[in-house]
Amino acid sequence: MKTRTFHADRSQPQPGEIFVFGSNQAGYHGGGAARAAHQQYGAEWGVPEGATGNSYAIPTCDAAINPLPLAQIGDAVQRFLAEAVAHPERSYFVTRIGCGIAGHRDSDIAPMFSGAPSNCSLPDTWAPYF
């Protein structure tokens, strides 16, 4: 069984942890966790997915800020998980991606992270789904 690590929702990552947040397909990080990612963790404007600075973007909305379908978010989550598995030396602080501005339910998003490796800290609000 995998060791799961959870952090308090809305808490801050520890020094060195990579801030994983929900973005939009335009890479305009203007609100919610995306804004924090841009202002505090080096997320680059115009980059909708992947690692920049000390952050990792997972698209949850389209360019017009409409929620993406769950299957599309799930595909992006799988790409992130592959990155986390490939880099066990890194620690990832996953926010409640898709559950803020995108409006999805925790019960829909949390299970997408069931394969998360032990170097991913997940929001404690997702603990019941594992």
Give a label for each model feature.
Residues 1-130:
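Macrodomain-like recognition of ADP-ribose-binding/processing modules
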